[in-house]
Curated annotation (Swiss-Prot):
Keywords: Aminopeptidase, Cytoplasm, Hydrolase, Manganese, Metal-binding, Protease. This is Peptidase B. Mn(2+) 2 binds at residues 195, 200, 218, 279. Probably plays an important role in intracellular peptide degradation. It is found in: Cytoplasm. Its main location: cytoplasm. Homohexamer. Its EC number is 3.4.11.23. The active site is at residues 207, 281. Its cofactor is Mn(2+). One of its GO terms (biological process) is proteolysis. It comes from the Bacteria. Mn(2+) 1 binds at residues 200, 277, 279.
């Protein structure tokens, strides 16, 4: 086996021969990362990406200055979807090592699950993987129900059934109950709702290849909230939380839904489909109805929902929407504590009325007259949250996945958002 390359940290600048902008230098003993105190975690992550680019696949994090956050920053940049990498971790105290191990187990699960090809990961497989992950960290404190196919239609989950019926792989709703109290009557503290579209062709509003080639990742919201619940459990979550994953393929077939179809939801809302590529909100609506019925203190939904959020924020931030200023502030504080990028975008009462239909109460997409696509999508979802003005957060997961590598990240999933949501759940 190749000897490990030693990676050490220094607060001194690199030798002048490396240039004044050098963030790392190479010597006979290995590679030194030169921290400047401005953005040390980002510097470590970017350096790790460069080290991986050199073809170095076995490293040892050595010397002083390493902690769980710095080790994790290195791994975020070093990990990539192709090939294998080995890291020999530094000595950490028990709490720091446990934190690092939990991140490696759970957030790597999120990244690997999002990166999985759609042929391998259908709606049923996604739901089962989520059950397996949560059960692994919570054992006997978890119960769950999986509803699929025609049972969804019979039980009134019309959004999920409508979107998923065009695929040979049946749509699936996972309802998972994490109840550490052991009391079946214990109140539900929070509900997490995730969009789990395991492949999104756009349906009859078909995507171009350039927009479809990454759509195996359209279940990123479901993976993120699953990982968040698992991670919160490892951090000692002692309150009851329910997880709802709305899983389906959005494909074209003789049985697929069409423009002009009208969906009637269990809360009485009627929605006209005018864009089959705005399917995420249609499946999330079913999950939000179930979440509202639990009367929790908070509901958090996460979805790779709109291109508009990516237009606004790129792949660098998750977009946050809420009518509840206090709760939004708490999530942003959690994001700051976890060093994860979130940015709040506008959501106002008027966005709820910017989806007019001539044939139903709501249209599932905006129009040229109302171009704020990410905000109107959030406004659409609010119609399925019973008390939408309090206790509800919507996360449009624009930072979940990168089609191409950048200086800090390989191509593929990032795992961003897991720690922030877990932090909020355990605060």
């Amino acid at each position: 086996m190749t000897e490990a390359m030693k990676i050490t940290l220094s607060t001194q600048p690199a030798d002048a021969r490396w240039g004044e902008k050098a963030t790392y230098s190479i010597n006979n003993d290995g590679i030194t990362l030169h921290l400047n105190g401005a953005d040390d975690l980002g510097l470590i992550q970017r350096a790790a990406r460069k080290i991986d680019g050199l073809g170095i696949k076995h490293v040892q994090l050595s010397g002083e200055g390493w902690d769980a956050d710095r080790c994790w920053a290195f791994w975020q940049g070093y990990k990539a979807p192709k090939g294998t990498r080995k890291v020999e971790w530094p000595d950490l105290d028990d709490a720091q090592r446990q934190e690092l191990d939990n991140r490696l187990m759970i957030i790597d699960w999120v990244r690997d699950t999002i990166n999985a090809p759609a042929e391998e990961l259908g709606p049923s497989q996604l739901a089962q993987r989520a059950v397996d992950l949560i059960s692994n960290v919570a054992s006997d404190r978890v119960t769950y129900r999986i509803t699929k196919g025609e049972d969804l239609r019979e039980q009134g989950y019309m959004g999920l059934h409508t979107v998923g019926r065009g695929s040979e792989r049946s749509p699936v709703l996972l309802a998972l109950d994490y109840n550490p109290t052991g009391d079946k009557e214990a109140p539900v503290y929070a509900c997490l709702v995730g969009k789990g579209i395991t492949f999104d062709s756009g349906g009859y509003s078909i995507k171009q290849t350039a927009f479809m080639d990454s759509m195996k990742s359209d279940m990123g919201g479901a993976a993120t909230v699953t990982g968040a619940l698992a991670f919160a459990i490892t951090r000692g979550l002692n309150k009851r939380v329910k997880l709802f994953l709305c899983c389906a393929d959005n494909l074209i077939s003789g049985n697929a839904f069409k423009l002009g179809d009208i969906i009637t939801y269990r809360n009485g809302k009627k929605v006209e489909v005018m864009n089959t590529d705005a399917e995420g909100r249609l499946v999330l609506a079913d999950g939000l109805i179930d979440a509202s019925a639990q009367k929790p203190e908070m509901i958090i939904d996460a979805a790779t929902l709109t291109g508009a959020a990516k237009t606004a924020l790129g792949n660098d931030y998750h977009a946050l929407f809420s009518f509840d200023d206090a709760l939004a502030g708490r999530l942003l504080a959690s994001a700051s504590q976890e060093n994860e990028p979130f940015w709040r975008l506008p959501l106002a009462e008027f966005h709820r009325s910017q989806l007019p239909s001539n044939f139903a109460e709501l249209n599932n997409t905006g129009s040229a007259a109302y171009p704020a696509g990410a905000s109107t999508a959030a406004g659409f979802l609010s119609h399925f949250v019973e008390n939408y003005q309090q206790g509800w957060l919507h996360i449009d997961c624009s930072a979940t996945y990168r089609k191409a590598p950048v200086e800090q990240w390989s191509a593929g999933a990032t795992g961003l958002g897991v720690r922030t949501i877990a932090n909020l759940l355990t605060a």
